[in-house]
UniProtKB/Swiss-Prot annotation:
Disulfide bonds: none annotated. InterPro entries: SAM-dependent_MTases_sf (IPR029063), TRM2_met (IPR045850), TRM2B_chor (IPR025823), U5_MeTrfase_fam (IPR010280). This is tRNA (uracil-5-)-methyltransferase homolog B. S-adenosyl-L-methionine binds at Q299, E349, N399. The active site is at C427 (nucleophile), E473 (proton acceptor). One of its GO terms (biological process) is tRNA processing. Pfam families: tRNA_U5-meth_tr. The gene is trmt2b. One of its GO terms (molecular function) is tRNA (uracil(54)-C5)-methyltransferase activity, S-adenosyl methionine-dependent. It is found in: Mitochondrion.
Length: 480
């Protein structure tokens, strides 16, 4: 055991929560001093002969280049960022109106004939992210066990992994956990998994935090040819590092581990294994408490999410009462937040774990008028619409991913005449969402099997959830 490690252990003052698994007393030091004996099939990482990336050809530092990649607006004042985003959203809406004006039977003009309200600023500008994923790859010094974000592309073969310590959007707690995980995998005898067919095991880490500082870490691991017993040794070492070793300074509340041979997979495809701590962390939004699982969707900026949900609630005020359809509902944040002003809320979500969280959240907050359904919206919604009563009216709120809504979802919404108002939340309105806008507003018969009355845009509000980046959420209201 190194003297530095002994010193850090002697000076740890953070309280250690109760462990979930039993760990051999001296396992971590055993791994450090006996790396080759753990798994003979895994060669220690050699960095002395690794090719180092060329220095930047410009005068920018690696840190500046990463900031320009991840947070391109970081050099601007926040007021200038908001103005830039407002003008960008205006251009997108003008593009939408130009496309809608091509419909020969609709009286759309090619200019903005509905109000674009002022952009809603984020209450917090720095360190706002409650979820960050740090990748593993070759660093500036050539070390393949470097945690951070990428500069370059795999296609060009010039990827460099740069530490994220300087990025404005990431909180210090996330940076601390990432640095500790980097330290751990550098001490481990297992190689990093950079390319699946090249072998290696340690992959990225995702860190989730809430506003009170509770922290969940999810470590991703490629088992390759390791036996379950061999993998268990490294899982135990990981737990010991974050509870009794230098990583204890992170004070993790939850430590999860996912073994997978795929780039991305759900909890259903490969179970998240709780190695240590609590099963969930919790966050409060607009007075409601929400449970967060390892893979459940939750807006990355809590304070700005509150502003977003308030905006959606205000734009839904004319339709108070009746039923709210919350499509792509995630953990139920929007539906539960709007539940006091609705008679009934029905949420639809693809990820089963998120639906379980949504149901739990409704019960936790004693909200009795919400129900949540798991499945693809394009499968669930058409059948659901036929069983809904139009008494009291129907309001739809849709919050899809960047892929937008499936055509069958739009068709079901269009063809149900009781829906008079639809609130569309998009983080990328100039992407696939633009197709949805056309489908919602096009003439009857112009798109296959759409027979319902067309919508028209009536008001738009940008909400900044992502300071220092070009992105924001656009809330666009359609009526008919």
């Amino acid at each position: 055991m190194s003297s530095a490690f002994k010193a850090m252990r002697l000076h740890l003052t953070c309280p250690l929560p109760k462990q979930v698994i039993n760990i051999p007393q001296t396992l971590f030091s055993y791994l450090i001093t006996n790396q080759r004996a753990i798994n003979n099939s895994c060669k220690p990482v050699k960095t002395s002969n690794a090719k180092k990336p060329k220095l930047p050809t410009t005068k920018l530092s690696w840190e500046e280049r990463l900031s320009d990649t991840v947070t391109p607006l970081w050099r601007m004042t926040y007021e200038d960022q908001l103005q830039w985003k407002y003008e960008h959203q205006k251009k997108i809406l003008l593009k939408m109106m130009k496309e809608l004006s091509q419909d020969p039977t609709r009286a759309f003009s090619d200019h903005l004939n509905f109000p674009l309200l002022p952009i809603v600023a984020s209450p917090v500008r720095d360190g706002y992210r409650n979820k960050s994923t740090f990748s593993v790859n070759k660093g500036i010094d050539g070390n393949p066990k470097t945690l951070g974000f990428y500069i370059g592309t795999g296609k060009a073969g010039n990827i460099v992994c740069v530490h994220a310590d300087h990025l404005l959007s990431i909180p210090s707690k996330h940076k601390m956990v990432a640095r500790c995980y980097e330290d751990f995998i550098r001490l481990s005898p297992l190689r990093p998994c950079i390319l699946f067919d090249d072998g290696g095991h340690w992959r990225e880490i995702t860190i989730r935090t809430n506003s009170t500082g509770h922290t969940m870490a999810i470590v991703y691991f490629h088992p390759q040819s390791l036996t379950p017993e061999e993998t268990d040794i490294h899982k135990a070492a990981l737990v010991e590092y974050f509870t009794q070793g230098p990583g204890a300074i992170c004070q993790l509340d939850s430590l999860y581990f996912q073994e997978t041979t795929m780039t991305r997979c759900s909890h259903e495809q490969s179970q998240y294994q709780l190695l240590y701590g609590q099963t969930h962390i919790y966050e409060e939004v607009l007075g409601f408490k929400f449970r967060i699982s390892p893979d459940s969707f939750f807006q990355v900026n809590r304070e700005a999410a509150e502003a977003l949900y308030k905006t959606v609630a205000e734009l839904s005020q004319p339709c108070v009462g009746g039923t709210l359809l919350d499509v792509c509902c995630g953990t139920g944040a929007i539906g539960i937040s709007l539940s006091p002003q609705m008679e009934r809320v029905i949420g639809i979500e693809l990820i089963e774990q998120a639906v379980e969280d949504a149901k739990f959240n409704a019960a936790l907050n004693r909200v009795c008028n919400c129900e949540f359904l798991a499945g693809k919206a394009e499968v669930v919604l058409p059948d659901l619409m036929g069983s809904l009563s139009s008494d009291g009216g129907l309001t739809a709120v849709v919050n899809p991913s960047r892929a937008g809504l499936h055509y069958r979802v739009v068709r079901a919404l269009r063809n149900h005449s009781a829906i008079r108002r639809l609130v569309y939340i998009s983080c990328k309105p100039d992407g696939e969402a633009m197709r949805n806008f056309r489908e919602l507003c096009c003439s009857v018969g112009l798109v296959r099997r759409i027979t319902g009355e067309a919508f028209k845009p009536v008001v738009a509000v940008p909400v900044d959830l992502f300071p220092h980046t070009p992105h924001c959420e656009l809330v666009l209201v359609f009526e008919r």
